[in-house]
């Protein structure tokens, strides 16, 4: 498993496509479609994930989510990639990229790979050495 991605998108078709593509690339994916679900999931996961965020969810603009992340104590500093069909301006330091709809899935995956860290894997034993006894 590479890392964890939270996808906040209110279009069910696009959500499912992103789920499939990210699962195929070995990411753990959490799908949400509202501001409340997005914030709840991020609070539960902490800053150990990447948020792929629709700029305008059905229940409000992404700016409210970005402000809520900054207001958390301590602030939730997860990287955010915005999805938008129009130009987006934001002052949030969390926003690391914007993907303009429609976007190529390969481009989206490249952006996710750039900002979603892989979990640390334990080092493999040196060749020819026996595993340590417990």
Question: Where in this protein do the model-derived segments appear?
Answer:
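The C-terminal output helix
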Residues: 113-134
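As written
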Residues: 3, 62, 91-100
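Two-component/phosphorelay signaling modules centered on CheY-like receiver
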Residues: 12-30
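C-terminal output helix
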Residues: 103-116
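Acidic, metal-coordinating helix/loop segments flanking the phosphotransfer/catalytic sites
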Residues: 33-50
